[in-house]
Amino acid sequence: DGNNADHYTSSHAEQADELARFIEENHGAFLTNKVYFDAFKRDNSGTYPDVRKRISELLKKGQLLINYTGHGNTTAWSDEYVWTQTDILQSTYTKLPIWVTATCDFTRFDDVNTSAGESVFLNAKSGGIALFTTTRVVVSSGNSALNKELYRNLFERESDGRARTLGEAMMETKRKLSGINKLNFILIGDPALRISYPEYKAQVTAVNGKAISDEPFTFKALEKITVEGEIL
């Protein structure tokens, strides 16, 4: 998300892409879904109805985590209002994700009006299980640094194979960063929660009786194959 009023243009999309690559390269057990505004048609009002539709579809299917990087405010994501407080209040999905919002003011909980981020957490029929979110204006470079550090801490396994708690992930993230931008990020939710990370790994050891090596396997159409593996 970028606009003509600032110099960010594609910066937010590039930052989001970097986060997706981190998951794909380091935590391949998780699937990433990316929603690019410009991959969809923009209507006459200046917004992207199909982006809103796609976000809604993904949330209904169930997501571990939803991350937005870009412009925003207390009631909406982006200058194009692709996801708004009204959308949040009207949602009916039941599988609640963790929300990460690297955008300005999304959860300004000390304002007289209820913010969109608060609506995510207070929503009785939908919303989110927890939020790593913002209470004030934040800057793009600082958001990117915090987002990357947060991902490293959220998805890193402890010695017992479990993920860190959300509170520990936020604590370690802020501890490793300097500057004041981090002070505008908060965790809303139970700090003792952990992401739903598989405690074990599945490893393929052989295909058609042949041990796994650096040599590629060749399969024919409709061929039946036997895959062997182990749980680590």
Each model region followed by its residue ranges:
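Cysteine-dependent hydrolase recognition
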Residues: 1-232
